[in-house]
Design a protein with these regions (language model features):
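Long, low-complexity, charge-biased intrinsically disordered regions
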Residues: 1-329
Length: 329
């Protein structure tokens, strides 16, 4: 059919449309595939002439996520079917879950739990429950990302308090199973002016330029904006004094990637922890820019990094700023 695998996302194939205004895509995963094209059914009929296709239709469920919408409307992604089926299984095995208003308790520190270590059977059950909810985070239930990242650290040796907190997460999902992510390609609107952070680094880096892979397809279609929100919790882990970084990647106005993880170094200050989180956000910015470019999507503007520590942003954005390195671990 003339499709080419993306250089950086080999499971996604692209093909230039006949009008030359954009690309059609086919995403594959094991024996599932998803077609995004102006005339998707023409490709589907071609595939049906060669392969046996099971239940071809507009996307409803893909990899466990529920897609709601029509080709001419905005789409949403939710995990409500997966959540309801999982909760039915859990309640059949463990009893009725109590509904919770939040996935975790404010100020909770699972690393301080000193209750009894789970036995081998309970240990396996804990790992099974963690894997199920980790897949939900991957599919789009990002509001439990921090809680699950924290509890996943104890998969090797969980205690009774940890499994209690894990059941709390499932209780939260039981109360709010219908949350979804809206897919919107419109650029986000920023309330604060960004001109003061639009510094020109050409004076300091006269010969610097962005590396462009020559194997990338020619950008076609409407340019899209990328933004990354980041934050840190300094010395959150009371045992190791490690800080936690949180990152949310947004393409257009749609969240596409998120993470909550311990920082590799022990930050000696809030400033240092925020800078480490910004470094992680910068790595994600490079990744998402290359991914979009490898699919032929125009990205004409730098990725905007949004944080809540003005001093960190100023030191990273302004060439004339003096970075006080003694405060960074």
């Amino acid at each position: 059919m003339g499709f080419t695998p993306s250089r950086y996302v080999p499971d996604v194939w692209y093909k230039l449309r006949e009008d030359g205004e954009g690309y059609d895509y086919i995403a594959t995963y094991v024996d599932d595939f998803l077609i995004t094209a102006k005339d998707a059914w023409s490709y589907m009929r071609h595939l049906q002439s060669v392969y046996t296709i099971k239940e071809p239709a507009h996307p409803e469920i893909y990899l466990g996520a529920l897609y709601t919408g029509q080709p001419s409307q905005d789409w949403t992604i939710s995990c409500k079917n997966y959540i309801k089926e999982a909760i039915t299984r859990i309640e059949h095995q463990y009893g009725t879950l109590s509904e919770e208003k939040s996935p975790s308790i404010m100020g909770d520190h699972p690393e301080q739990d000193d209750l009894t270590i789970l036995n081998n059977e309970q240990h396996r059950e804990y790992q099974s429950l963690i894997r199920m909810v980790q897949w939900l985070v991957t599919l789009g239930t990002l509001d439990i990302c921090y809680a699950i990242s924290s509890l996943s650290c104890f998969s090797c040796c969980p205690r009774e308090g940890h499994i209690t907190l894990l059941f709390r997460v499932w209780g939260y999902l039981k109360k709010f199973p219908n949350k979804s992510i809206g897919i919107c390609a419109q650029d986000p609107v920023y309330e604060e002016p960004l001109e003061e952070f639009r510094a020109d680094f050409e004076d300091q880096y006269e010969y610097a330029s962005e590396e462009i892979d020559l194997a990338f397809p020619e950008p076609k279609g409407k340019p899209i904006a990328t933004s990354i929100f980041f934050d840190s919790d300094h010395a959150h882990d009371t045992e190791t004094r490690q800080s936690i970084s949180g990152v949310l990647v947004v393409v257009g106005s749609t969240p596409v990637s998120w993470m909550s993880k311990h920082q590799g170094a022990v930050a000696t200050s809030t400033y240092s922890a925020e800078f480490c989180a910004m470094r992680l956000a910068t790595e994600e910015a490079i990744t998402i820019q290359y991914m979009l470019c490898s699919l032929g999507i125009p990205v004409n503007e730098p990725t905007k990094l949004c944080g809540d520590n003005l001093r960190v942003i100023q030191n990273a954005s302004m060439p004339e700023a003096t970075l006080q390195k003694k405060h960074i671990a």
